[in-house]
Regions:
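Noncatalytic scaffold domains of N-terminal-nucleophile
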Residues: 1-31, 35, 43-229, 233-235, ...
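Short beta-strand scaffold segments in enzyme catalytic cores
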Residues: 62, 66-74, 378-382, 442-444, ...
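Internal maturation/activation junctions in enzymes
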Residues: 299-396, 408-409, 416, 521
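Short, well-structured alpha-helical segments that form the helix of a local strand-helix-strand
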Residues: 44-51, 160-171, 241-244, 307-324, ...
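Extended C-terminal subregions enriched in glycine
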Residues: 337, 434, 467, 476-522
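Short, small/polar residue-rich loop motifs at catalytic or cofactor-binding pockets
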Residues: 265, 374-377, 438-440
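Active-site rim segments in enzyme catalytic domains, especially the processed small/beta chain
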Residues: 56-60, 67-83, 88, 97-98, ...
Length: 553
């Protein structure tokens, strides 16, 4: 079916309620989370219920084969975070993966769009890129254990209770939404994997909008997790299927790799931006990039420019450019290498000096004082009547991930390992047990003691750029919550160009400043969700570029 998702723009209003609020990219998933709140669960229970439902109704973006991160503010005012992100298998060394790439008959299929690499001969690992698809791109999935840990440590209901709506959608069926049908149509790697074809195609075709589908295999796996707990994924039947599938396709993951995984609770990192405190997760993800960009933008007064001016976009984009260069150079798994304090105000002052009236060409990495353009991810935000707020993000990285579905489980496995490098001295060089650089970044903002928001912007390297723009829209320009998400966006791109939405008013002025401006489709500018609690009132806003919905009671 041919249709244009972006032909017309629909108007949305922010949603207000006091009993509870859920905002996410799929209405059916939002309703699943809301049902848990109505049944007495708290925001954390509802977050897992919503995430599980998204696994079913938005399977192009998320699932049990991926990872999950959470950033939250509890009813008593504590700000915390959880990382459920696994690492590389114990046998996944640079040498082993490089040899496998050179010798495997199907290695070319692991590199979409002829990425260019050496397959035959040569001893230099620099000739090789880390595979983007296939068994070596799969790291230990953290989602199942992350869901279980969230409910056990922060929730009030059982895992079986919160998984029930998702299981019902998977077994009984649901109508596919417009945006998800669009992405489902564009998943060509499914056609090369028998288990994926059986689990996610219907009479050999992706579903059309409104078509009712069932995902029985996935639903059966979820029911097993509900009955037996996450151990079945890491030590039992489902884990055995994951390890066997990866090994059958030439990878190294074992049941022992899966069994060794545990989620972690971490101290968030934060900075202030024009009086608002913004909290992010610490490395191994992009949180520090967002904070560094906010600090640089504050230092140069980026938010002082008129909203419609090219000077505003130029200033913020240059701050983002420098933060990306630094983040991609320094951020790695902190258990393997120390990550410097990129979020310090002093470092931002040094970096701000490089920004002028024209774009920086070939920016150099800063030295802190210290001792996929597109990606498929889901984000949800939840608030409850007790005062809990949570930003919860779940992803397999690129679409259906590695292109591998684990046997008859219906679980599509992520390709986060594609972020590793096969160059030994690279900050994100592949090492056994090491966690890859992660794009997932949920966020919390504190405007004052009685005014907090859980928010985020899904979408690969758009995520920290989206955080910067949403916070500035709220803080610098006084926008309402839905307005801040509706506003036209820009994004700095890896090739040095500046992508903008067609409705961004500053395009011509940016070209005059020397920017190489490209008009991009709205789907490349991320998907934001936000729930704000001001005094005792919850306000929800959702991404107009997605199918999403904010619902409250």
């Amino acid at each position: 079916m041919a249709y244009d998702l972006d032909r017309f723009t629909s108007r949305r209003s922010a949603v207000h309620a006091t009993g509870g609020m859920v905002a996410t990219s799929q209405p059916l998933a939002a309703q699943a989370g809301l049902s848990i709140l109505r049944d007495g669960g708290n925001a954390f229970d509802a977050a897992v219920a919503t995430a599980a439902a998204l696994n079913v109704v938005e399977p192009t973006s998320t699932g049990l084969g991926g990872d999950v991160f959470a950033l939250y503010r509890t009813a008593d005012g504590e700000v915390g975070s959880m990382r459920a992100c696994g690492g590389a298998p114990a046998e996944a060394t640079i040498e082993n993966v490089s040899q496998s790439v050179r010798e495997h008959d199907d290695a070319e299929s692991w590199y979409p769009e002829a990425r260019g690499y050496a397959v035959d001969g040569g001893d230099e690992n620099e000739d090789l890129e880390m595979p983007f698809l296939g068994p070596h791109a799969v790291t230990v999935p953290g989602t199942a254990r992350g869901w279980e840990t969230t409910v056990e440590e922060l929730g009030t209901l059982s895992l079986a209770d919160v998984l029930e709506p998702a299981i019902r959608y998977a077994i009984d069926g649901y109508p596919v939404s417009e945006v998800i049908s669009y992405y489902w149509q564009g998943a060509p790697r499914l056609f090369t994997d028998d288990h994926a074809r059986e689990a996610y195609l219907f009479e050999e075709e992706p579903p059309d909008p409104g078509q009712v589908v069932t995902l029985e295999r996935l639903g059966e796996s979820m029911q097993k997790i509900a009955d037996e707990g996450a151990d079945i994924v890491y030590e039992g039947e489902i884990g055995e299927a994951i390890a066997a599938e990866i090994q059958d396709q030439g990878g190294f993951m074992t049941l022992e790799d899966l069994a060794a995984f545990e989620p972690e609770f971490l101290e968030p990192v934060s900075t202030t931006y024009n009086g608002t405190e913004v909290f992010e997760l610490p490395p191994n993800n992009q949180g520090l990039i967002a904070l560094e960009a906010l600090n640089i933008a504050e230092e140069i007064g980026a938010g002082d420019h008129p909203y419609d001016s090219p000077e505003r976009v130029h200033a913020f984009a240059e701050a983002m450019k420098l933060a990306f260069v630094d983040g991609h150079h320094y951020i790695t798994d902190p258990e393997y290498e120390t990550v410097p304090p990129l979020a310090s105000k002093a470092f931002a002052r040094e970096r701000a000096a490089a920004i002028g009236d024209t774009p920086i060409q070939d920016p150099e990495v800063g030295v802190p004082t210290n001792a996929a353009e597109d990606a498929d991810t889901v984000l949800l935000t939840v608030g409850d009547s007790e005062g809990n707020l949570v930003s919860y993000i779940n992803s397999r990285f690129a679409g259906f991930g590695s292109g591998i579905v684990a046997g008859d489980t219906g679980i599509a496995l992520q390709n986060r390992g594609a972020s590793f490098s096969l160059t030994p001295d690279h900050p994100n060089s592949l090492e056994p047990g090491k966690r890859p650089f992660h794009t997932l970044v949920p966020a919390i903002a504190k405007f004052d003691e009685d005014d907090w928001a859980a928010f985020g912007v899904m979408g690969g390297y758009m995520q920290p750029q989206g955080h910067l723009q949403v916070i500035s829209n709220l803080v610098d320009y006084g926008m309402g919550e839905q307005e801040a998400l509706d506003a036209p966006r820009w994004r700095y791109r890896e090739d040095g160009t500046l992508g903008v939405e067609e409705r961004l008013p500053a395009q011509t002025g940016l070209v005059r400043k020397g920017h190489d401006v490209r008009i991009l489709q709205p789907s490349l500018f991320g998907g934001a969700q936000l729930v704000r609690r001001t005094d005792d009132v919850l306000t929800g806003a959702t991404e107009p570029r997605k199918d999403g919905q904010a619902v409250g009671f």
